[in-house]
Structures are given as structure tokens and as C-alpha cells.
């Protein structure tokens, strides 16, 4: 599809990333690749599909101190509309905090700003955060504080 065509040229993808970071005034060496749940933090790699791998390999070949971070779970559109979907996501995140895995107590939830344009969706997001803090003692931090970054 459209993302595959976009990602076909890693030089262009990287150029876009650099341009967008400069335009937005971002100085972080952390990147999320569009349409790709791919990770590279130091020597750790996870879920690097072929397209993402090419971009990551390019950054490595340029000796860029770049981290690529994906997500452990994501907020789906139906969670913005249905509270039961929010409860399901709360349980999923809670389970991830106790599951044996790399960076066990650290969970990245992918959220897209366009999913929070209604008062209902904002109420659901507030509930999500509060319930994770109450039930699982979750702490929310900037991605820059993720282990290894």
C-alpha cells in the first residue's frame, strides 16, 4: 500500500524524519517509524520488518545515535467510543507490567492525537490513566526515560 511505497526508499524516509524533526524543533534521538512497530535501542531489536530494517540499517551505517521505538499495545478507535474497550486495554497494559519480558515494567502505549477530539474520548483517556495508576500503580513518563535510551 501507500506506506510500503513510502518506505521503499530508506534515504527518503530518513530525509523526511530529519526534516520533520527540524521543522518541529525536536532534538530527541528517538524515532517511531510510520506504520511500523519496530524497535532498536542499542543492540536490542524487536519487530524490525524488512522496510523498517532498511531505515534502521541506514541510520546505523551513518553512525547516528538513533533509537527506534515501537509500541507494546495501542489505543484503538473503539476505545475512544466504548468504555468496555478501555477496560480491556487497562487489563492488557496491567498484564504487560507483570509479564516476564525485556524492560518488563515499561509499557509503551501508542496513542494518536486524532483519537481524542471528543469529550467522550478525553473522558475515556482520563479514566484509562487513573485506573492504571490505581490498579497497577503505573507511572507515566516521557519516552526519553525509557530504559536504554
Segments predicted by a language model, with ranges:
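Low-complexity, Gly/Ser/Thr/Pro-rich intrinsically disordered linker/tail segments
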Residues: 123-149
Amino acid at each position: 500500500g501507500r506506506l510500503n511505497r513510502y518506505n521503499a526508499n530508506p534515504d527518503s524516509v530518513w530525509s523526511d524524519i530529519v526534516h520533520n524533526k527540524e521543522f518541529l524543533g525536536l532534538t530527541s534521538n528517538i524515532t517511531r517509524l510510520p506504520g511500523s512497530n519496530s524497535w532498536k535501542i542499542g543492540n536490542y531489536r524487536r519487530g524490525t520488518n524488512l522496510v523498517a530494517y532498511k531505515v534502521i540499517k541506514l541510520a546505523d551505517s551513518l553512525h547516528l545515535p538513533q533509537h527506534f521505538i515501537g509500541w507494546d499495545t495501542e489505543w484503538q478507535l473503539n476505545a475512544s467510543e466504548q468504555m468496555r474497550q478501555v477496560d480491556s486495554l487497562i487489563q492488557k497494559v496491567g498484564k504487560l507490567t507483570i509479564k516476564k519480558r525485556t524492560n518488563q515494567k515499561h509499557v509503551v502505549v501508542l496513542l494518536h492525537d486524532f483519537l481524542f477530539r471528543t469529550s467522550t474520548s478525553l473522558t475515556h483517556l482520563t479514566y484509562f490513566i487513573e485506573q492504571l495508576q490505581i490498579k497497577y500503580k503505573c507511572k507515566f513518563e516521557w519516552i526519553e526515560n525509557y530504559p536504554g535510551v
